[in-house]
Amino acid sequence: MVGCGVAVLCLWVSCGAAAGQLEYSVPEETERGVAVGNLSADLRLPAAAMSSRNFRFLSSHRELYFGVDLPSGNLVVREPADREQLCRAKAACVLTYDLVLEDPLELHKIRIHVLDTNDNSPLFPAGDVQLHIPEFLTPGARFTLPNAQDDDEGSNGILSYSLSPSQHFRLDMGSRVDGSEYPELVLEKALDREQRATHLLVLTARDGGLPARSGDAQVTIIVVDTNDNAPVFERSVYRTKVPETAPNGTVLFRVQALDPDEGSNGEVQYSLSNSTQAELRHRFHVHPKSGEVQVAASLGPPETLLEAYIEARDEGVFGLASTAKLLVEVTDVNDHAPELDFLTLSNPVPEDAAPGTVIALFSVKDEDLDSNGRVICGMSSAGPFQLTASFDNYYSLLIDGPLDREQISEYQVLITASDSGSPPLSTRRTITVSVADVNDNTPNFPQPQQELFVAENNGPGASLGRVFAQDPDLGKNGLVSYELLDVISEGPSASSLLAVESSSGAITAKTSFDFEQLRGFHFQVEGRDGGIPPRSATVTINLFVVDRNDNYPVILFPLPRNGSVPVEIVPRSARTGHLVTKVVAEDADSGSNAWLSYHISRASDSSLFRISANIGELRTARLVLPTDAVKQRVVVVVRDHGDPPLSSSVTLGVLLSNSVPQLLPDFEDVWEPGGQLSAQNLYLVIALACISFLFLGCLLFFVCTKLHQSPGCCAQSCCRSTEDLRYGSKMVSNPCMTSATIDVTTVERLSQTYLYRASLGLGSDNNSLLLRGEYNAADLRNLATGVGLNLPISCIQIRNRKGDHANVNAMPRQPNPDWRYSASLRAGMHSSVHLEEAGILRAGPGGPDQQWPTVSSATPEPEAGEVSPPVGAGVNSNSWTFKYGPGNPKQSGPGELPDKFIIPGSPAIISIRQEPTNSQIDKSDFITFGKKEETKKKKKKKKGNKTQEKKEKGNSTTDNSDQ
């Protein structure tokens, strides 16, 4: 509460200058900091003097509700004061403080009156009120209600009470001896518990404050019952009929009377009234609680009407009672039940039977008399049936509506025949009516159109799906067979692609589907039942072929021509990002299976080129350096995004040149590393070549020196011409040599030449020839003769030696099928060659000799052996052709070696060396260098079975690229 203005009630000063008393007033709950009065002004002291005179403010209360603001000299509120808490029930609430000043000493009393505010609402200490008022009280009765309390004083206290509206009660104020008032509840209208047992009222107390406050209490009035109602029967007269033979204890009926009173006033007991004749009282028994009326003795002869009275009385202090009449008619005993006799019964009934069709005809009879012999016939069934009386005691069971076997195949018809006796007797007969099936339902497919998804590349006979039609008919009428209708699809007929199993509806494929050729089609399947006449329905099936990743990407550009590598020319001044070419490819698949990406799988210089992964543009990744090789090869792989992915590749040749050459170089050689690596290889080749020439010169000089110094050397053998030394030598001084071996060895790629080396060892006492492989006697003679060694068979020793050389066979072999003659292989090969591929040994008609394969024109001869071009070579490309047999072979001398050794399958070196067992070693190395000549490819169509090929000079090469 905020009090802004403070009234000074009284101000005086007593005891002269030594003492004084000040009084102030302030409303309760005033907020902190509000000024109550100005002490400085009231004491006639400046505000500064209060501090200088050691001003002290003393209080007897625990809490300091008020204080002095020294700068202004005001008396201010420190804590809000609650009058109800400080003074409780006191009429006046005053707080006293002492004010002490020194120099001179002064003592002042301060009295602060805390004024009441309306901050409390009226409150009923007892809470809600509950009153029990009997319903027999008359109007005017008074009932005291509790007072409300309000902690406020004066006009803020309670001034008035009020009551919620009620037609039975009003509020009045009563006075006590001391003059205080209290509220009273006055009964205005009599209460009736049976109408309303509880009344709810609200008592409100309101004070006189501004604004006014109020408090409520709920007054619950419970009406106490009194026995003011008599029991009432449901009926005033109860009538019944009882057979004369009813046994004792038979319940005739149950009576019931209701009393609206409460408790014992509403509890009812039953008994026979005193108004009942004495001779009838022993024939009936009434149960006092349930009100059942039972037979206690024989009721007498038939057709007798007995009259009795039943009394119902409550258990109140003054019990109230009421009576009801009982009329009991004794009737004849109905001891015969009706009888049913069926004359005709049709079962089963076809479901297409027309309404009015007679199912059964029967008669009824009862041997009782009068009403006991009158029979009433009824029927109970869930089916469309009707029971009709034909004539006297004859009934017909008819069809009253359509039958549907698919919904209900069997009905239970209950026929009841009851007489009119009391109680009536009846006979029940249940007839089972079966409904025979008729073909009245057409096969039904769940959907008129269905979709079928089939993955391509399925195997013939694979199951694709199943069609199913429902026919609710029975037996053959519901047995559906399926047939493929070949009337809808365009293009190939559906019957050529599919088959439908007639009994199960299973759809199988006759062929394998290809998404790229056939993406989908539609067809119809007919479902026909076995009824007479049959019914049918069709379903349209849309078959969709689902794509699989079964097609490799096809590169459209660039394409190799005649098996050569496509070449692009890039100026050496090209900047970074220069477009070299664009690889164009397509994929016959669809979706992600046809989404292609490009990347470089191999390149002569991986840092020189880059390719766009999405569009396939091959561009330079950096500037062309002077050290970059002129010829660059790039392998671009095109890969789709299927699962698993498929890919294709193309090899591109890139010529780094500022001008267009008249003749494009060959890009089919070995992969060359670019940049600094190529220059290093060039220096290495030059160094190796120099060292090789120096070594061979020294070796040749050493061999010649040894030959001249050999003691067993004749002039003829030592003075051979250079041509003789080049191809071989004849040994005459010793019939047996220490060892003779024939090795086929490859050399490093030094230049575009072949190296043939023959090494012979002399002067050994071990007369044996060492060969690798297995030979017969004829082969050994041919071998000895072929290498120019006149040795007897006894001087030849066969020894198997582990190594990479294979056995020598007499038959020629075809070239290696995996060999590709590229430009890179014209310089040499890093491989080992089988001995048997170096030459063919055969015994001619003139004696043992050796026929070496030579490069010759491929003129076909009837008895000549011919070696076809290597695998991978083109038809018109240069190839190796070998001729074997007696077709004009070039005979070699016994001491000569052929001038050229041609090895089918791979270029190689044939070396013939003899190794003595002693430390004396004589070696003669013969080195020849022959240039290979490259020729252009020539195409020539074949007519007939065989054609002749043009002769080529030198060693021929192929133009297939090694990818």
UniProtKB/Swiss-Prot annotation:
Its main location: membrane. It comes from the Eukaryota. Residues 844-963 are annotated as: Disordered. It comes from Homo sapiens (Human). Gene3D superfamilies: Cadherins. Residues 705-963 are cytoplasmic. Keywords: Calcium, Cell adhesion, Cell membrane, Glycoprotein, Membrane, Repeat, Signal, Transmembrane, Transmembrane helix. Glycans are attached at N38, N248, N274, N562. One of its GO terms (cellular component) is plasma membrane. PROSITE patterns: CADHERIN_1, CADHERIN_2. Residues 1-18 form the signal peptide. This is Protocadherin alpha-C1. GO terms for molecular function: calcium ion binding. Residues 812-907 are annotated as: 4 X 4 AA repeats of P-X-X-P. GO terms for biological process: cell adhesion; homophilic cell adhesion via plasma membrane adhesion molecules; nervous system development. The keyword Membrane applies. Residues 19-683 are extracellular. The keyword Hydrolase does not apply. The lineage of its organism: Eukaryota, Metazoa, Chordata, Craniata, Vertebrata. PXXP repeats lie at residues 812-815, 845-848, 886-889, 904-907. Residues 922-936 have a biased composition (Basic and acidic residues). It is a single-pass type I membrane protein. Residues 19-124, 125-233, 234-340, 349-445, 446-555, 570-667 form the Cadherin domain. The chain crosses the membrane at residues 684-704. It is found in: Cell membrane. Potential calcium-dependent cell-adhesion protein. May be involved in the establishment and maintenance of specific neuronal connections in the brain. InterPro entries: Cadherin-like_dom (IPR002126), Cadherin-like_sf (IPR015919), Cadherin_C (IPR032455), Cadherin_CBD (IPR031904), Cadherin_CS (IPR020894), Cadherin_N (IPR013164), Protocadherin/Cadherin-CA (IPR050174).
